[in-house]
């Protein structure tokens, strides 16, 4: 009996050691892949604990996915060592505030209202990437500048449609220079305010001439390096998914804002994203709608480009549920620049 007890204890200890070694191996690989460095051993222990907890949540969700209880899969990514509250405060920077009244010396013009094209049969699927109107996925880093990436993406698409040339535009130009228009750099902003700044400023510099830094810096716009201009902006009727669909089909990529405040979005990997807790009014993240379609399982979706690099989501993209009561607010604050 004593021998049996000793054997059980030995096996339990061996399994514990093996599990610990496995976690450490995965942790070390995670740090290497995502270039993680911590200020102290104490911080690393805390980050490891958060990482393990997030892995557990992801595994439980994916079990439900395998059972057909979820429509999308999650995956460990570079944000796996962050508390969800940290993550949201760091990267979600869409500020839906009516700051027009408090702006001094700057006039934010009223948007042009989108008029749906008459007698036009829109296709069942659209993907502006295939038409060459979308630049590669970018990475905003630890800066709440999502709004600037959404704005440049929409203008890049409109500029391409007008000129046939795809030019990557400078988010840093918007972060540094559009403050008096109501934007707050790494602390958030709005795409419409960015479009207004670009119009009044006479353009926005190219990404090459004004590279991204992921910090608030001094404005050094160069009029000789302008990559695109706009004449104002068009707002899609609030909450109208059908109007958003027609705009995507006939105009090009559209700036949208969504509720990305959920852990499920932090670790999204593939599939059609539907989060029951999503809000259609409390929006916190600016992204770019570049198309729409229907999955093999019959789920309608919006094809959305994010600005968290290619290691997040499906190579940097997410399929958001479509025709589900304006899910996550995809059509609540949709707009595009006039060129």
Curated annotation (Swiss-Prot):
List, from the UniProt record, the residues annotated as the active site of this protein. Answer: 146, 285, 306
SMART domains assigned to the protein according to its UniProt record, in alphabetical order: Inhibitor_I29, Pept_C1
Identify one Pfam family in the record: Peptidase_C1
- Keywords recorded for this protein, A-Z: Disulfide bond, Glycoprotein, Hydrolase, Protease, Signal, Thiol protease, Zymogen
Give an example GO molecular function. cysteine-type peptidase activity
Something else the entry says is:
Negative correlation between cathepsin L-like peptidase transcription and titers of dengue virus type 2 is observed in infected mosquitoes.
How does the record describe its quaternary structure? Answer: Dimer of a heavy and a light chain linked by disulfide bonds. Interacts with cystatin; the interaction results in inhibition of cathepsin L-like peptidase activity.
Name the protein family. Answer: Belongs to the peptidase C1 family.
Q: What is this protein called?
A: Cathepsin L-like peptidase
Organism listed in the record: Aedes aegypti (Yellowfever mosquito)
- Taxonomic lineage from the root: Eukaryota, Metazoa, Ecdysozoa, Arthropoda, Hexapoda
